[in-house]
Structure formats: C-alpha cells, structure tokens
C-alpha cells in the first residue's frame, strides 16, 4: 500500500485444476474426465486502514518460475477479534495447543468440546490458523463453537484422504452452532 509492504500472501496452484468424471472429482486427468479450474482464495489483514486514493500493488517476491493471475481483490474493514466468551473452553487450554504452528490440533478441539459439554456449552477457537488432520465428530448437542472472527480464526482441515476432514454430526446430535 503506497509502496510499503503491509502483508505477504502464500499462493498455490495445488488445487487449481480438478477433473470431473461422473459424480466424482479427481486431482489427476483421466479418460472421460472433464477439466475444471478453480481459484485459490487467500486473505490477510493489512494492519492498517486503506484510504481513498491509496495505491495497492501486488508484487511477486519469490524466485520460482510460476506465473500468477490475480482475478480480483476485495477489501473490507475487518472487525476486531472477538474475545473469549466468559465461561468458554478454549482449544488453547489443551496441553500447550497453539495456532500457526503446523501441528495437528484435532485432540485439542475434541478435548475442548468434551469439556464444554456440561458446564459452558461454548468452545472458543482463538485467532490464528488451527489445523485439524482428521474428521471431527460432534458428540454433544447444544454446543456453540465460536471463533475470534472470520478475519482472525482460520480452521484448516489437512487430511488428503477422501472424507478425511470436516465436521460430522454423530447420531442424535443437534443444536450445534458454529460461528465466526
């Protein structure tokens, strides 16, 4: 912004092409599969307000040979991070779990959901990127899973196995709220 570096974005073409055959989506081309292009969406906080007439420039700083096409950028004012609600159980309370470390936080989330099942019913996922390497079963009705806000908490499922990530509502579970 105005010739000052305010953020760095990591872009990847890893999921740029998918191949559809019947009801299935594949990462590799094959007979009868139709190629489909998708976009890598990334977001970041700039740490400052962008004002009218500011100049925004995106510059490639890596030395790879990849070309990048930027379709568009979208700017919006990000709300401040949401603080931990009173009485909430935080995933960060689990044995030193912390965001942005590349470590699987599945056990921390499962622990927090089990702890919140009776006393508070709220699980808090603080700001940062939290990685989950497997499918997370929701076992308790009435839970609220609360992040620090869409610009602050990132939930990333890292399994490369089909059906290996995401949330699954186990039998009889309902009334779960996931927010921010």
Residue map of PLM features:
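N-terminal extracellular ligand-recognition/capping segment immediately after the signal peptide
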Residues: 106, 110-163
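Hydrophobic beta-strand segments of well-ordered beta-sheets in folded domains
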Residues: 54-56, 88-89, 121-123, 179
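Parallel beta-helix/beta-solenoid
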Residues: 168-180
